[in-house]
Amino acid sequence: MADTAVARRPSAPTTGRLYVKAIFTGFKRGLRTQSEHTSLLKLEGVFNKEDAGFYAGKRVVYLYKAHNKTLKTGHTVATRTRAIWGKITRPHGNAGAVRAKFHHNIPPSALGKRIRVLLYPSNI
């Protein structure tokens, strides 16, 4: 029975991402009508309405690459990356989907693509 102390090495600070991944699944719709001003997002790791309610009011962003580079205000280098910002308004259904409204409507080419759900503003 040797009492050897195990030397613990301090772990490196882990830098995680500050957003939750979501998939743009479509627009809010009825049987024959579609509302392009409201998008439906399926959040990764969220499976019920109560968990989806936590994300109400959080900011969302759709990042995409454009054809031409432009210089944004406050930056010194031109980039092709563009962003469309929005906000989660409420849960949708019972399976963890949410509704989001964007400042400019999301293009249909974004169906099935990634959306970032930022964890601010925080309500905890």
Swiss-Prot record:
Q: Which InterPro entries match?
A: Ribosomal_eL33 (IPR001780), Ribosomal_eL33_CS (IPR018266), Ribosomal_eL33_sf (IPR038661), Transl_B-barrel_sf (IPR009000)
Its gene?
rpl-35A
Please give the superkingdom of this protein's source.
Eukaryota
Q: Does the keyword Cell inner membrane apply?
A: no
Asked if the keyword Nucleotide-binding belongs to this entry, the reply reads no
Q: What is this protein called?
A: Large ribosomal subunit protein eL33
- Entry's family note: Belongs to the eukaryotic ribosomal protein eL33 family.
Annotated PANTHER family: 60S RIBOSOMAL PROTEIN L35A (PTHR10902)
